[in-house]
Amino acid sequence: GSMRLTSPLSPAIHTGATRILVISTRDGVPDRLPATAPEPPSIGEMAAYALDIMFNDNLEADTERMLRINNTVSLLSPEAREKTPLKVIETLMLNPSQDIRPIAKRHRGSLPRAMRILMRSLGVMGGDGRMESYLMFEPDYVSDLIALGYADTLARRDEVAGFLAG
């Protein structure tokens, strides 16, 4: 939902969700600034950043907005809560325990030749793996992502089970 929507959680909220499980592809660790002034980004790198913003920034901003509303609603008296259409929506966000871009970089050689040529011509192939992480659906890469998600979810198994049990 976060590709078309600036508020990707909105459809779930407006259809009456009382709990939302949010699964993100961003590890939550901010990117480090380079020690030296970077080269100007290529067209492909700018496109990769645009994809990152479209998918992740909107999701994170919407989740943060919902948590602020939850906090505000929880401060209201029971009488005041009855007068507002706002309600507390339980939320659990699952983030990968590691940045998925290095995983994409490891698998970039498995991209079809035409895709590698296109990405090289756009100046992306030597980059940080951001574009590849969005475009790659090669079986080994997807398997690594599934394994990471599975391990991360097992590490939070009690929290996830409690959330799903309601």
What does each model-found stretch correspond to?
Residues 1-166:
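Patatin-like phospholipase
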